[in-house]
Amino acid sequence: MSSKELFELAAKLFPMGVNSPVRYFKDYPFYVKEGKGSTILDVDGNKYIDYCLGYGPLILGHSDPDVTRAVIEQAEKGLLFGEPSENEIKLAEMIKETSKNIEMMRFTNSGTEATMHAIRLARAITGRKLIVKMEGGFHGAHDYSLIKSGSGTLTFGSPSSPGIPDEVAQTVIVGKYNDENNIKEIFQKYGDKIAAVITEPIMGNAGVILPKQGFLEFLRDITQKHGSLLIFDEVITGYRFAFSPFQDIMRIDPDITTMGKIIGGGLPIGLFGGSEEIMKNISPSGNVYEAGTFSGNPMSMAAGYAAMEKLSKQDYSILKKRTQKLVSGIDDILDRKHITHTIKYYGTMFQVFFADHVNNYDDALKARKEVYFKLFKALSKNGVYLPPSQYETNFVSFAHSDSDIDATLAAFEKAVAEMD
């Protein structure tokens, strides 16, 4: 069946035919048949160099043979036991050894679960109710994350989705990423009531928005001053740029860290962790409840350990050089066409904005989304797949070769010409 035919069937089964909103785009999404290395093949026979990579987990590329082998071997032993297995210890030990601020952790099934439980834990430890999150920051699809700014910069947030009670929104204050004065004012007004600040160290769900020099250090200082906790959401950034969390590269010590994506090797996973003192509050050693039927399940643990074991032997500098080559090439193409743009990138992740600067969420909102979507459609026709949304992130994997980068730049040349 073709993608169009499959979508017509899917539209009768799922809202708008998809199981996650970002997968839908006009006129209909293509349906993937298989992925190998840096590429995906759709049911219509079209092959794409993939920079979406499952929205981030596949840093080793599609169908990595070592990860695939580990999954098959585990499947033959059992899919789920409801009891502990050795691989969860092996994966946790590897994460603990390479993460300065994680002495103890709890595996979950997604980044959404991880941040939800991290927020509950912070509230329990501090005895406080309020959470500060950043405008445009995404921490999963739970009620405490889906909050946007209220009518004023120092007011409580408002629900960004129907179904979230106003009472929930009244426990979340939305701050401005990269705006120290705004965060200072929030703490001056609510400081002794704030349980935690949660932020992505690099905002990856608003495109790619980098922290200004000193901003993350400022968050660490002001939370410590007021007895609040600092939560770094490293679901995207963890093990993305080196075999460590991003916080270790920046030498910043949050109280609680959440991770996901890469550490699962392509299978569902999440994690929240911190010092032993903090994590001992989680049940059954403490009274902060957290549980999950599939948490630490043997399939995800096997895939995660195999992926992390292989990743520990990789040279990240090669990956960064390829990303830089790609970004520089795209920048040159758009410059020669006199198209106003900026490319935000760090290490192995990047996004193209059609605006002259993007330093915060407000800037990202002003970028010309319609031009980005034209680029997305034109690139798809030329065999390159970027996320369809301006506010997602592109990733380069260890499976991407120099020839992939060259082919991508050639496709960009054609795509930009077709956009005229």
From Swiss-Prot:
Broad class of enzyme this protein falls into: isomerase
GO biological-process terms attached to the record: protoporphyrinogen IX biosynthetic process
Keyword Isomerase: yes
InterPro entries documented for this protein: 4pyrrol_synth_GluAld_NH2Trfase, Aminotrans_3, Aminotrans_3_PPA_site, PyrdxlP-dep_Trfase, PyrdxlP-dep_Trfase_major, PyrdxlP-dep_Trfase_small
Record's catalysed reaction(s): (S)-4-amino-5-oxopentanoate = 5-aminolevulinate
Keywords, ordered alphabetically: Cytoplasm, Isomerase, Porphyrin biosynthesis, Pyridoxal phosphate
Cofactor(s) it depends on: pyridoxal 5'-phosphate
Presence of keyword Cytoplasm: yes
The family this protein is said to belong to: Belongs to the class-III pyridoxal-phosphate-dependent aminotransferase family. HemL subfamily.
NCBIfam families (UniProt xref): hemL, PRK00062.1
Protein name, per record: Glutamate-1-semialdehyde 2,1-aminomutase
Provenance organism: Thermoplasma volcanium (strain ATCC 51530 / DSM 4299 / JCM 9571 / NBRC 15438 / GSS1)
